[in-house]
Amino acid sequence: MEGLVTLILAAGLGKRMKSKHPKVVHKVCGKPMIEWVVDAVEEIGSKEVIVVVGHKAEEVKEVLKERVKYAYQEVQLGTGHAVMMAEDLLPEEGNVLILTGDTPLITSNTLKELINFHIKEGNSVTILSSVLEDPTGYGRIIRDKSGNVIRIVEDKDATEEEKSIHEINSAMYVMDIAKLKKALRMITNNNAQGEYYLTDAVEIIRDMDGKIGAFTVPSEEITGVNSRVQLFEAEKIMRKRINYRHMENGVTIVDPDTTYIGAEVEIGADTVVLPGCVIEGKTKIGSDCEIGPNCRIVDSEIGDGCSVTYSVILSSKIKNNVKIGPFAHIRPETVIQSNVKIGDFVEIKKSIIDEGSKVPHLTYVGDAEVGKNVNMGCGSITVNYDGKQKHKTVIGDNVFVGCNVNLVAPVKIGNNAYIAAGSTITEDVPEGALAIARSRQTNKEGWVQERIKKGRL
């Protein structure tokens, strides 16, 4: 919105979180709380965003980097004091949207409606309010007999009569900047907490003949996060929003209550997500896939028509029509091309598996290039580590690797080669060759009976 400046208060200690980290960097559905707020503000086109930081400021700056400007509140002396610390960064006129960094559930639609209401009503201050069944802990909106807002009283300073009011202050506002700057010079810390309340500025602006209004929204959006329990509650609401959005876009989520999908995940239409899945980071999943049950996928790309069952995929790329699992572990920097099968109890690490190949079960492939239409037998492994360094295995196209084979890297297997079961391969295998590297079998007939006679069995 043209000319709008946003001020986000994020300097609090967050003592109830019992954490060494600032409250606002704790994550909701994989994204720091403060980032949810900044995202919502950017969606409405705020001209400038200023964040007031204090406690562990560097951690907040590490999250937001250069997306915003910063003001510093070295000592936490209340919300009014926090705004004072940013006063020099505010223009002389216009409107400022004041938000808190611990309200990740606020949406851009609500902010647009709040600002439009403020402008339409010609208010000097518009308070974002809500009606709570239990308003304990929140400041109350005090209205006169005509319903006009006259002031806000903090919970700790409220009388018993005022505490019976259920309309609460969310600590989010739109304010006329010129009037706000005048009011900041007049507020005092003469209250139970010895702090400078921004709420006092509301009453001062009213006394300047400024019009005060309140825009009421559902309580869900203004919920602040002050403890781990409230973090869980916010997470639950956000997870429901995310899951419902995917379902509305054509994704089947069989049990949304047991499905965790991060904020930045993309999923194509007609994909089915079964119970117990955790899909995080910047993961992209194509159409017509079946994911789960009980999978974890992080920062990975999965193409169309794939099946992933009881498996973990980390920072990897999976092309189309790939079957993975059950109980496979795809580790970072792996690329699996189309029409590949990765079966049960298989681990793939930093490797390329080319089209049409099969790694069906009980196999480790690390630091390897596996060609097209390769079959890796049960129990086959690439021996990639010599105790100091990792080494590469290269397997050509149409190679058959028998069961219980060790490929000791660095080693190359030529196209169309066969590796006999039980072999430990330490040298390159030529194209089209059969490699056998195992001891000959020796049968000692009558050995068992002889041992029995001697009392040794």
Curated annotation (Swiss-Prot):
PROSITE patterns: HEXAPEP_TRANSFERASES
UniProt remark on cofactor binding: Binds 1 Mg(2+) ion per subunit.
The keyword Cell wall biogenesis/degradation is assigned to this record: yes
Keyword Cell wall biogenesis/degradation (UniProt): yes
Residues that bind Mg(2+): D102, N226
Keywords (A to Z) from UniProt: Acyltransferase, Cell shape, Cell wall biogenesis/degradation, Cytoplasm, Magnesium, Metal-binding, Multifunctional enzyme, Nucleotidyltransferase, Peptidoglycan synthesis, Repeat, Transferase
Region (Pyrophosphorylase): 1-228
GO biological process per UniProt: cell morphogenesis; cell wall organization; lipid A biosynthetic process; peptidoglycan biosynthetic process; regulation of cell shape; UDP-N-acetylglucosamine biosynthetic process
Residues annotated as binding acetyl-CoA: N384, Y385, A421, R438
Enzyme Commission number(s) of this protein: 2.7.7.23, 2.3.1.157
UniProt-annotated stretches for the region N-acetyltransferase: 250-457
InterPro entries from the UniProt entry: Bifunctional_GlmU, GlmU-like, GlmU_C_LbH, Hexapep, Hexapep_transf_CS, MobA-like_NTP_Trfase, Nucleotide-diphossugar_trans, Trimer_LpxA-like_sf
Binding locations of UDP-N-acetyl-alpha-D-glucosamine: 9-12, 23, 73, 78-79, 139, 154, 169, 226, 331, 349, 364, 375
Catalytic activity: alpha-D-glucosamine 1-phosphate + acetyl-CoA = N-acetyl-alpha-D-glucosamine 1-phosphate + CoA + H(+); N-acetyl-alpha-D-glucosamine 1-phosphate + UTP + H(+) = UDP-N-acetyl-alpha-D-glucosamine + diphosphate
Cofactor(s) the protein requires to work: Mg(2+)
Pathways involved: Nucleotide-sugar biosynthesis; UDP-N-acetyl-alpha-D-glucosamine biosynthesis; N-acetyl-alpha-D-glucosamine 1-phosphate from alpha-D-glucosamine 6-phosphate (route II): step 2/2; Nucleotide-sugar biosynthesis; UDP-N-acetyl-alpha-D-glucosamine biosynthesis; UDP-N-acetyl-alpha-D-glucosamine from N-acetyl-alpha-D-glucosamine 1-phosphate: step 1/1; Bacterial outer membrane biogenesis; LPS lipid A biosynthesis
An annotated Gene Ontology molecular function: magnesium ion binding
Annotated TM spans: none
Catalytic residues (positions): H361 (proton acceptor)
Gene Ontology, cellular component aspect: cytoplasm; membrane
Predominant location: cytoplasm
NCBIfam families attached to this UniProt entry: glmU, PRK14354.1
Subunit structure: Homotrimer.
Family from the record: In the N-terminal section; belongs to the N-acetylglucosamine-1-phosphate uridyltransferase family.
Protein name (database record): Bifunctional protein GlmU
Source species of the chain: Thermoanaerobacter pseudethanolicus (strain ATCC 33223 / 39E) (Clostridium thermohydrosulfuricum)
